[in-house]
Amino acid sequence: MDGSNDERLTQSVESFCLQNGDDGKLVLVDKMSQDILYSYDLKTRKKEVISCEGGSIDPQYVCFDGDWVFIADDCTISKTNYKTGECVYIWEVPEGKNVNITDVYIHGDKVYFGLYGTDSEAKDDTGLWCVNPDGTDSKKISSDEVNEVCFVGEEYFVR
């Protein structure tokens, strides 16, 4: 924490997040690597590949919930159990919709994500959305443009 022990974990980090709790795990998305998704143990300094086979194919956004890493690319959201390698699709952009996912965040019993409409027909879809972790009941929460989302208590903040 004093900056005296800097260490390069990877060449290129697209996204990262720290696991809640005492496990001290960091998840890294490394676009320059063949494996892309890693878990890094801050205590042992051990880096391990997390399998995301069968899930989002181009991870850009990640967040933790227990043993699950929630992963999003431009058009899909999936979750991977970093201990077992189990991977499950949660949600994907409906066919024919010109929108991109802009972030993903798990809070309580919902997965929150930003959508950005890339053409005039999809502009109404721009905003903060949520979905159940099993992929059901997706709904729009706000029309705010979302680059990042986080929660403090029960209040959300977007940038």
What are the roles of these predicted feature ranges?
Residues 118-159:
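Hydrophilic extracytoplasmic domains
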Residues 13-23, 55-66, 97-107, 145-155:
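Repeated scaffold domains used in trafficking and secretory/extracellular systems
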Residues 1-4, 41-45, 81-85, 132-136:
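Short loop/turn segments that connect beta-strands within beta-propeller blades
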Residues 5-10, 46-52, 86-94, 137-142:
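A short beta-strand motif characteristic of beta-propeller blades
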Residues 35, 42, 51-82, 87-105, ...:
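Eukaryotic tandem repeat interaction scaffolds
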Residues 33-39, 74-79, 119-129:
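Structural motif
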Residues 4, 14, 52-55, 95, ...:
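Disulfide-stabilized cysteine-rich extracellular repeat microdomains
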Residues 26-30, 70-71, 112-115, 157-159:
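Residue position within the beta-strands of beta-propeller blades
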